[in-house]
Amino acid sequence: MTTQTSTGLRHQTVLLDEAVDALIWRDDGIYIDGTFGRGGHSRRILERLGPGGRLVAFDKDPAAITEAGTVEDARFAIEHDSFAQMAQCLDARGIERVAGVLLDLGISSPQIDEGERGFSFRMDGPLDMRMDTTRGITAAQWLAEADERDIARVIRDYGEERFAVQIAKAIVARRGQSGDRGPLDRTSELAALVAQAVKTREKGQDPATRTFQALRIHVNQELADLETGLKAAFDRLEQGGRLVVISFHSLEDRIVKRFMQALARPEQSAAPELRRAPLRAHELPAPQLRLLGRVKPSEAEVSANPRARSAIMRVAERC
């Protein structure tokens, strides 16, 4: 589904049919779309729900909340918050159990294509990178104040960047200069600085890709939110309920895979002394999730939407 947003920008929802097919197993259930984005998944879910179904969506982005305001459906509700706050928000709505949770962890095309948001290294704009522009510090503010070791750690750990130390040194050195060469506050400045610091090139990838990813993850606490959100989602699932997660880079996918496998194969994640003990079948820890598989976009989808190429969808069902 290509969504024409209220701002006129277009967004192609990744794994649209595959995700909704995996999520909806009864049409009268309560479902969660943890990342409304520009509404592609939410609108398709509403098409599939019966009169008794409900959908609660979450998003930190004010632009997504504006877009959600165009959904005219009494079965739909939107929360201006992270899916990490799912438990509190559902409690406030009196919802104890849900039939399914969908988390699409990708950044939306309008966020990338709108230079003013600060996510893109290809378009000049303020070095912001906040999903929620109403709260928190910007990437520029953090880079202007953070310790060099912290900058290197974030770029290395969240961007898997080999040249993290060199990039961090260049950022801190830039802070000590005066005039127009002072602290970074534009995306184009950061992209140019990284290009000078990164000595080798990966085929088909801009040298700034990993650094921009790392800063976005850090500014928005994406991995911490993911771990909290996965636990909250599992805790709310009813028996037979589905957990569907679409990730776009290896850091996210490792967290999702580890979380699902720990609940599906608890005997493998048990303490070493328990794994070595001679236990009878009824003494083994019972699985709490059943893994339903992993799906990647088809060649046709990637051809139509190159941004889908790194997507991996994992599906599990509560036992």
Curated annotation (Swiss-Prot):
What's its catalytic activity? cytidine(1402) in 16S rRNA + S-adenosyl-L-methionine = N(4)-methylcytidine(1402) in 16S rRNA + S-adenosyl-L-homocysteine + H(+)
The answer to keyword Glycoprotein applying to this record is: no
What EC designation does it have? Answer: 2.1.1.199
InterPro entries with a match to the protein in the record? RsmH, SAM-dep_MeTrfase_MraW_recog, SAM-dependent_MTases_sf
Q: List positions binding S-adenosyl-L-methionine.
A: 39-41, 59, 83, 104, 111
**Some GO term, biological process aspect, for this entry: which one?**
rRNA base methylation
Q: Which PANTHER family match?
A: 12S RRNA N4-METHYLCYTIDINE METHYLTRANSFERASE, S-ADENOSYL-METHYLTRANSFERASE MRAW
Q: Where in the cell is it found?
A: Cytoplasm
Protein name stated in the entry: Ribosomal RNA small subunit methyltransferase H
Instruction: Identify its protein family.
Output: Belongs to the methyltransferase superfamily. RsmH family.
Leading EC class: transferase
Function description: Specifically methylates the N4 position of cytidine in position 1402 (C1402) of 16S rRNA.
Q: Name one GO molecular function term.
A: rRNA (cytosine-N4-)-methyltransferase activity
